[in-house]
């Protein structure tokens, strides 16, 4: 002991003697600078590991370039030009907005004003990808039904369950009917599926991610959560990551454009809270290998969310009709939550979606309970406090009026037309279909023409398709609107391809140059800034 003390004293004296040559300020600053350098190196290493060395170096280079005199002003001016072009030549509705209340109420004139505004909308009947999922003569009766249901409950709010017991029951029945479609009757699901209605697919996804984060924090003590998604997963997962401070590990799709299970496995670590599979994914209409992802989730004891926002009211019926649909719901071991939109193929009013959980233990982590508020005790199941009971009633009316037979009939029509469109696209020289579509989304690209120029020609013919990237492509989300005009779509598409082949190059007012440049631009931060500028100018 004495030897150790003696050694420590001699070490102290030697250190003091050595350090006595330095100014006190140096002794104070040196460890602080060393700490700063260590933190900078750690942050740089983390950025490289997360985004890649090339991306980090490019971002640093762009930051340095923007510091040069005049460069930043030039970039801002060019961004303004692009935003104006995206807004159809700079035309904005903000210049015609009503900004003050009328002095005297307009009474019934408001209906005339609304009709005038509505007349400015794009003619969506038949030529929009997705967007409106019912059309034709039967749509008028369907809209009338759900509008009447909405009007009966337009004053209700399920936040006040003690007052509006009817709406609470309607929501419970919508959730239960949906759970019955997605596996609650199968023993493998555990029979405890539960959930809530939300305002749309994004809120359902936000809640599933938040719930998984809190559940895994309670279960495993994870405080630096990470989730694994395929690059084809919906952008709502990035929104959830930003909202809830979750690190995203984005995995490239495999050669079939599906979630790469091996890539997912490589990303799993002690901070992983969840994985995401899509059925189908929005870009290409392909169902990820949910069973294999479920095996991973079970093996590593993490959550697995299945995004059924598009497929929830098609896949169960397509499977019954004999289409080769791979497993996608709670029948798959490892699936802990599912999101599905009623306002798409469920034909409910816009603003209705459902988030489901495997059991109540998981769902409890979705709720927010507040005990210290002077306004009393408070608990809310979803992100919104007040919710429109009219939308819940509209969803209930849509589902119960159509029934199993109605959904089966609709699914049969759109699945048949989807396959015809797929085959028709494959027959057009210069086009190819991406992957093997499982459902009603058909994505296609070209190796001989600029597909975005094709999109501009299609837009001039009244079609509204979705532009995709990596690879540059388009897709059409087939709905009941298209069942009677799919031949017109294929004819217009072939004519558009022929036009671009004969006269390559952008058309006046087209967006092909913007989409093409955005896809090739290496600085994704610049693209992000453009999107933010566009949104700020648009709303």
Swiss-Prot record:
It catalyses: sphinganine 1-phosphate = hexadecanal + phosphoethanolamine. Its main location: endoplasmic reticulum. Keywords: Apoptosis, Endoplasmic reticulum, Lipid metabolism, Lyase, Membrane, Pyridoxal phosphate, Signal, Signal-anchor, Sphingolipid metabolism, Transmembrane, Transmembrane helix. It is a single-pass type III membrane protein. Residues 76-539 are cytoplasmic. Cleaves phosphorylated sphingoid bases (PSBs), such as sphingosine-1-phosphate, into fatty aldehydes and phosphoethanolamine. Elevates stress-induced ceramide production and apoptosis. This is Sphingosine-1-phosphate lyase. It comes from Oryza sativa subsp. japonica (Rice). The gene is SPL.
């Amino acid at each position: 002991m004495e030897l150790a003390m003696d050694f420590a004293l001699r070490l102290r004296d030697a250190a003091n003697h050595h350090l006595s040559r330095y100014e006190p300020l140096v002794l104070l600053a040196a460890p602080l600078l060393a700490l700063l350098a260590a933190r900078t190196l750690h942050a740089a290493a983390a950025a490289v590991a997360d985004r890649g060395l090339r991306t980090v170096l490019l971002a640093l280079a762009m930051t340095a370039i923007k510091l040069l005199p005049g460069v930043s002003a030039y970039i801002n001016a060019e961004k303004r030009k692009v935003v104006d072009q995206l807004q159809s030549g700079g035309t904005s509705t903000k210049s015609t907005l009503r900004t003050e209340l009328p002095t005297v109420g307009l009474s019934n004139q408001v209906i005339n004003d609304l009709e005038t505004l509505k007349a400015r909308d794009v003619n969506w009947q038949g030529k929009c990808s997705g967007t409106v999922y019912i059309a034709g003569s039967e749509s008028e009766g369907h809209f009338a039904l759900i509008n009447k249901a909405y009007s009966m409950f337009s004053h209700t709010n399920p936040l006040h369950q003690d007052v509006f017991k009817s709406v609470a029951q309607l929501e419970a029945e919508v959730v239960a009917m949906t759970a019955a479609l997605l596996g609650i009757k199968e023993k493998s699901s555990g029979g405890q599926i539960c959930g809530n209605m939300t305002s749309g697919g994004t809120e359902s996804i936000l809640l599933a991610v938040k719930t998984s984060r809190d559940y895994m924090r309670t279960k495993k003590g994870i405080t630096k959560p990470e989730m694994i998604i395929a690059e084809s997963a919906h952008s709502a997962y990035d929104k959830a990551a930003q909202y809830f401070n979750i690190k995203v590990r984005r995995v490239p799709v495999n050669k079939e454009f599906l979630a790469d299970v091996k890539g997912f496995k490589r990303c799993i670590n002690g901070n992983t809270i969840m994985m995401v599979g899509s059925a189908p994914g929005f870009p290409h209409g392909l169902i990820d290998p949910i069973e294999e992802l479920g095996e991973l989730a079970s093996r590593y004891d993490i959550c697995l969310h299945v995004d059924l926002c598009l497929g929830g009211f098609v896949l169960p019926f397509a499977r019954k009709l004999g289409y080769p649909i791979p497993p996608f719901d709670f029948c798959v071991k490892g699936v802990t939550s599912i999101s599905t939109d009623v306002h798409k193929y469920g034909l409910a009013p816009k603003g209705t979606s459902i988030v489901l959980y495997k059991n109540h233990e998981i769902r409890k982590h979705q709720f927010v309970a507040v005990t210290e508020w002077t306004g009393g005790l408070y608990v809310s199941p979803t992100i919104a406090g007040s919710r429109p009971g009219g939308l819940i009633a509209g969803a209930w009316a849509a589902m119960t009026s159509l029934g199993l037979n109605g959904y089966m009939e609709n699914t049969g029509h759109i699945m048949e037309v989807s396959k015809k469109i797929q085959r028709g696209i494959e027959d057009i020289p210069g086009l190819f279909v991406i992957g093997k579509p499982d459902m009603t989304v058909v994505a296609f690209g070209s190796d001989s023409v600029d597909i975005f120029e094709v999109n501009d020609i299609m837009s001039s013919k009244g079609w509204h398709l979705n532009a995709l990237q990596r690879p540059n492509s388009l897709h059409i989300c087939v709905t009941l609107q298209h069942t009677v005009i799919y031949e017109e779509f294929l004819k217009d598409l072939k004519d558009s391809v022929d036009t671009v082949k004969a006269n390559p190059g952008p058309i006046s007012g087209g967006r092909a140059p913007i989409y093409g440049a955005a896809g090739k631009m290496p600085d994704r931060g610049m693209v992000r800034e453009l999107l933010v500028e566009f949104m700020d100018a648009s709303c």
